[in-house]
Amino acid sequence: MSLQDPIADLFTRIRNGQSAKKVSVTMPNSKLKVAVAKVLKNEGYIADFAINGDVKPELSIELKYFEGKAVIENIQRVSRPGLRIYKRRDELPKVMGGLGIAIVSTSKGLMTDRAARSAGVGGEIIGFVA
């Protein structure tokens, strides 16, 4: 099975896992998915992630809940393969007035919108998390 948009698949698996109250979700591994998982973990949206398996590695993301409610209220893809969205550093969006994050792919790697602003770089808006 080939995925046309692996990041949209990652976001959908997280959304579906949290709506079903799953402890963790697994998916095929890629460097970009691991980078997104690192950003989500550093910002406190997921509990942890791990890469399992040698021959066919899978990324396992441990979902996070607070008082029985999912920590991630909204996670959505912005830039997609058919329509890439790029923004300069002064055009980077603030999600929910700064309460959420935008995941940005920059020349310095994947980071949040706040980190990209402070680093003085823009890039492709991967998605919004709130």
From Swiss-Prot:
One term under GO cellular component: ribonucleoprotein complex
GO biological process: translation
Keywords: Ribonucleoprotein, Ribosomal protein, RNA-binding, rRNA-binding
PROSITE patterns for the chain: RIBOSOMAL_S8 (PS00053)
Molecular-function annotations in GO: rRNA binding; structural constituent of ribosome
Top-level taxon in the UniProt lineage: Bacteria
Listed InterPro entries: Ribosomal_uS8 (IPR000630), Ribosomal_uS8_CS (IPR047863), Ribosomal_uS8_sf (IPR035987)
Family classification: Belongs to the universal ribosomal protein uS8 family.
Function description: One of the primary rRNA binding proteins, it binds directly to 16S rRNA central domain where it helps coordinate assembly of the platform of the 30S subunit.
UniProt subunit comment: Part of the 30S ribosomal subunit. Contacts proteins S5 and S12.
Protein name per UniProt: Small ribosomal subunit protein uS8
